[in-house]
Amino acid sequence: MACKHLPFLALAGVLLAYLCSQSEAASNFDCCLTYTKNVYHHARNFVGFTTQMADEACDINAIIFHLKSKRSVCADPKQIWVKRILHLLSLRTKKM
């Protein structure tokens, strides 16, 4: 009787191992954990941005600014300076 269930148990084990590896992969995202304390006044050093939403992978909402120096800056989307830089970047892309 046990031999009848062995293929099913083996398949269930493989499926469980696959699902566990997928959930680990989802947690490997680079998320902003804190916001920068610096205030940036000029958009000239920024080349773009990414929006991070708080969901299963990341804990906080953030704007990730990408700088010419290949660095990234995590900013609070509620801050006035962040909204101003986003506006300036959108104007820059409309001109292109």
From Swiss-Prot:
Gene3D superfamilies: 2.40.50.40. Residues 1-26 form the signal peptide. Its main location: secreted. Disulfide bonds join C31-C58, C32-C74. It is found in: Secreted. Keywords: Chemotaxis, Cytokine, Disulfide bond, Inflammatory response, Secreted, Signal. One of its GO terms (biological process) is immune response. This is C-C motif chemokine 20. PANTHER family: C-C MOTIF CHEMOKINE 20, SMALL INDUCIBLE CYTOKINE A. Transmembrane segments: none annotated. Acts as a ligand for C-C chemokine receptor CCR6. Signals through binding and activation of CCR6 and induces a strong chemotactic response and mobilization of intracellular calcium ions. The ligand-receptor pair CCL20-CCR6 is responsible for the chemotaxis of dendritic cells (DC), effector/memory T-cells and B-cells and plays an important role at skin and mucosal surfaces under homeostatic and inflammatory conditions, as well as in pathology, including cancer and autoimmune diseases. CCL20 acts as a chemotactic factor that attracts lymphocytes and, slightly, neutrophils, but not monocytes. The keyword Repeat does not apply. Low levels in thymus and lung. Belongs to the intercrine beta (chemokine CC) family. GO terms for molecular function: CCR6 chemokine receptor binding; chemokine activity; cytokine activity. Induction: By TNF in experimental allergic panencaphalomyelitis (EAP) and by TNF and IL-1 in primary astrocytes. One of its GO terms (cellular component) is extracellular space.
